[in-house]
Amino acid sequence: MNELIKYKLELLPDSPGCYLHKDKHGTIIYVGKAKNLRNRVRSYFRGSHDTKTEMLVSEIEDFEFIVTGSNTEALLLEINLIQKNMPKYNIKLKDDKSYPFIKITNEPFPRLLITRQIKKQDGLYFGPYPDSYTANEVKKLLDRIFPFKKCKNPINKVCFYYHLGQCNAHSICQTDKAYWDGLVEDVKLFLTGKDDKIVTGLKEKMLAASQAMEFERAAEYRDLISGIATLRTKQRIMSKDLQDRDIFGYYVDKGWMCVQVFFVRQGKLIQRDVNMFPYYNEAEEDFLTYIGQFYLDQKHFLPKEVFIPDTIDQDLVQAVVPTKIVKPQRGEKKQLVALATKNARVSLQQKFDLLEKDLRKTKGAIDHLGQLLQIDRPYRIEAFDNSNIQGTSPVAAMVVFKDGKPSKKDYRKFKIKTVTGPDDYASMREVIFRRYSRVLKDKLEMPDLIIIDGGQGQVNVAKDVIENQLGLQIPIAGLQKNDRHQTHELLFGDPLEVVELPRNSEEFFLLHRIQDEVHRFAITFHRQVRSKNSFSSKLDGIEGLGPKRKQALLKHFKNMTAISQASVDEVRSLGIPEKVAQALLDSFNEV
């Protein structure tokens, strides 16, 4: 379990919702639901598990969560998220075939079926349902209420269900299309929650049966009404009108805004987008700017409707978003916007909590590092690394960390000027001297600790320059890597010794970050220099092509391939004479 997960586990709410486990690549590998997100997600990282769960846990590097309004919402959201992301550890539910739907066929005598394959041209589909049992329970209830054709028997042959009162295909004339159309509409209303008409009719039949002393029949109607009530649980995650819409919510705090967008397709929440950024104007104005830019990106599908919070000017949004804009005022639709807003608040609070915890731990790491090395608290740390390939294009780089955080405006790059060939010691000597003689000359801020990305030899060279050549007293430490190029040992002292540093300590993580950052910065600079040198060398020998013209070519064309494909006029446009331009292009043809 890494540090990020440890932080996030402390931030989980005691609310129902869904959680999404991610691997080291950021890929969603498992989607789950929970009545209590805090308890459920924490359980993955506590105690022992079976082999399958251990495999899952071993790959988890991060997780997200979405708060829902009820456990049922969490269940339905889980289904939709699995369909959308197809996580590998949800293998039994990884495609649409795994989810049952209720289908009304487009046949002249419609039938109610359960299917796992969707072919929209063949009928109407309702779902998905979480499992076959649930879908079958709903279908059984529908079969008892709506007398659709139950089998594929010829229409002139009476089936078993006709005698149960559950099939009218034999008794209804084949030409009575209006009857079947009406039955289909009743089912559509029923499955989208608009079942008042059906319940009223059943209550009337129950009362009539009771008055006629047909108590068994009355009990059947009573059970049907009870079954309908069970299915009446309202879902904010599932939109009953099956519309495509985007639902926006936002929350602001401490100068930051979080915008949360729920993407609802065919009435189901399939994905969300979370974006956090500092805002500089009124919150409502910056939100308008955000939503106006949101649909300029071709990646964002424009739905039939966009829901926005009631604090936003609807007309202004309508002016920049070419679809129907809705500010829900009541009921389920308003609750959907409230849910998006709630998740925006939770996400923003999580960001602040993580930042605060990270800051506390980083400051603690700096304190502990100072204590470990027996020096003053190293507020400003400057780290150095060399980079070259067999002595070609040698460079060095310096990064600065202030209070445990990178200060990129203080980063510096160095081209090695006095060293020929691959000599890391001499290169380090040059760079340290150039850096700190400049610090002395310009009276710049001195570091509290210098870190050398290297072993004993390079550290001793740096100490010699600092103490003997420049007369400074600055603590210097070295970071050695192992054969896998990973942070391995901290060297410090006089003489240098390995400082024992627990691999799971905050101090180790801080030093690891510093070493990775200075190495990245040095490597990037070396690649830039090597590329530029390679570019220039290929242009050497062309008469009339001096350094300034080479620089102009590099700036304009970026690479040799682009130059080789250019015309004489394009090259001349950079102020290069026609004769020189022609000679340049001819040199590529010769190759």
Curated annotation (Swiss-Prot):
Domain UVR, chain residue ranges per copy: 196-231
Assembly mode: Interacts with UvrB in an incision complex.
Keyword tags: Cytoplasm, DNA damage, DNA excision, DNA repair, Excision nuclease, SOS response
GO cellular component: cytoplasm; excinuclease repair complex
GO BP annotation list: nucleotide-excision repair; SOS response
Location of this chain's protein in the cell: Cytoplasm
Listed name of the protein: UvrABC system protein C
Organism lineage string: Bacteria, Bacillati, Bacillota, Bacilli, Lactobacillales
Originating species: Streptococcus uberis (strain ATCC BAA-854 / 0140J)
Stored CDD domains: GIY-YIG_UvrC_Cho (cd10434)
Gene Ontology MF terms: DNA binding; excinuclease ABC activity
Short name of one Pfam family: GIY-YIG
